[in-house]
Amino acid sequence: MRTLTGTGPDLWNHDGGPWGVSDLVGNAWDWVSGIRTFNGEIQVIPDNDSAMNVDESPDSPCWRAVLEDGSLVAPGTPGTLKYDAVAPGTDSPEDIGIRGGYRLNTEIVNFNYTGHEEDISHRAYGWNFFRDLAPAESVTVPQVLKLLGAAPAPGGCSDDSVFFLRNYGERIAARGGSWFDGPWGGIWELYLRETRAFIYPDIGFRSAWADV
């Protein structure tokens, strides 16, 4: 079944009412601000400052990494949380998927891509169900990552939402899945596979009206 954007019943809106947000799941991936990965390290813009007109460029000083206790620190600080691949990566220059998924870790044991191509935008990637994203042994996942939807909350991710990632280079977040995903689209679906220059028919964004 197909529906036009925003034309579903009120029950499909986030609050079940006529003024709720529609199409949070499916339709198109939504680019979101304030969260990214850089070489697998999870980085955020603190205090919801990304809702303002702040610098979110690749080298912005606003980005912060996350420690196990939830502290926000400078990117590259030892012990910050990262998305580490479970399976070894590949040096193949092809855009191939690597099975095994990811774990939250304080170091990167396995990058998806281990080659030396200058353009790393579309090399190897991985995926797993978001609910299966677990910490490595002895690693603590802070509440802030669960609140940001960057790590699953216990008992809160029962659907088949998928987590996609390339844990090398800068990757910008999109959420919610698209019409391509079918039953795997879900509210927890998180897409950290592409660069900020990526364009595709099933990736969009949510605009906001501003009185200027």
Name each model feature, range by range.
Residues 49-51, 193-194:
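Short, low-complexity, polar/charged sequence segments that are solvent-exposed and flexible
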Residues 45-47, 53-57:
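Flexible gly/pro/ser-rich segments immediately N-terminal to CXXCH heme-c attachment motifs
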Residues 6-7, 15, 22-24, 28-36, ...:
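C-terminal, surface-exposed recognition/capping segments
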Residues 38-48:
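A short, polar/charged loop-to-alpha-helix boundary motif
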Residues 1-5:
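Internal maturation/activation junctions in enzymes
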